[in-house]
Amino acid sequence: MSYRYDDNTSIKASYNRMVQYLHLLSNTASPTPLDIWAPSGKYIKPQLLDQYAIGYFKRFKEGSYTLETEVFYKDIQNRIDYINGANLVANNEIETVILNGKARAYGLEFLFKKNEGNFQGWIAYTLSRSEQLTKGRTESEPGINNSSWYSTPFDKTHDFSINASYQFNEKWKFNSNFVFQTGQPANYPVNQYEYQGINVPVYDANRRNANRLPAYHRFDIAATLTPEKNKTRTWQGEWVFGIYNLYGRQNAASLAFRQNQETFRNEAVQTSIFGVVPSVTYNFKF
């Protein structure tokens, strides 16, 4: 549903209902990023999502610039999560270590774009929260986080990005992209005990996802070379030279804890997947 105030201004509202039969479980405390997909069935109900949104849209200078803002709220039913101490690796009875709960997500999205000229780009920012409430199977079972709201693995308070491109001439085009995101929620141990000479971390069952991985950010650049079109060919090609994560940020994919062999204390071990990644790509189109 939309209402046009004038040729450059409009207000839009929307409602969506979606059903998902595959459920994702993530664990950032494993030595490597761990994602488990669980299908709906006798013990796992399909996930239902109701989304409400209202937005304001504005064009400037005959569409050379556009501004988009939107407020949204999502209500999610039957969202699963794993119980405290669950083993997600090689578990053939995953339904025995998960509980059904409900979740909510809400926030504000902002997007400003420059659409014309040799220099184009956009700035985007999202301020949001994503939380879950998961009670036990019975009234006597405490549930997750003592049956209180807690952050989901997808909760990113701040999500900021800038994209810019410059058409230098008919052959060369330069692009850059910067991304900053609040670190993913995680569980850190609050204590430890010794068992058969090994320090075992202890987690607070009432503080699910109370900690966070370090903030995620990176800067990418690329240059695109488009040679003059060969009139004898029916297709046009281009070369793309890029560098992903230019300044080599070691973004954390997960965080695990192990015993230091010198101090015999548990220490955090960060797993990072990508550092600086140069690339050369050749694209063609007919």
List where the protein language model places each region:
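Residue-level signature of outer-membrane beta-barrel architecture
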Residues: S2-Y3, P46, K58-F60, F112-E116, ...
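Surface-exposed extracellular loop regions of Gram-negative outer-membrane beta-barrel proteins
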Residues: Y3-Q51, Y73-E95, G136, N177-I198, ...
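Short loop/turn motifs that connect adjacent beta-strands in outer-membrane beta-barrel proteins
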Residues: D6-N8, K61-T66, N118, K171, ...
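Transmembrane beta-barrel strands of outer-membrane/channel proteins
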Residues: A13-R17, D35, Y56, L67-Y73, ...
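C-terminal beta-signal and adjacent terminal beta-strands/loops
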Residues: V19, I76, K171, F180-N199, ...
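Extracellular loop and loop/strand-boundary signature of outer-membrane beta-barrel proteins
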Residues: P33-K42, Y56, E93-L99, G107, ...
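Residues that define the transmembrane beta-barrel architecture of outer-membrane proteins
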Residues: L48-Y52, K102-Y106, N115, K156-F160, ...
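Gram-negative outer-membrane beta-barrel transporters
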Residues: Y73-D75, I94-V190
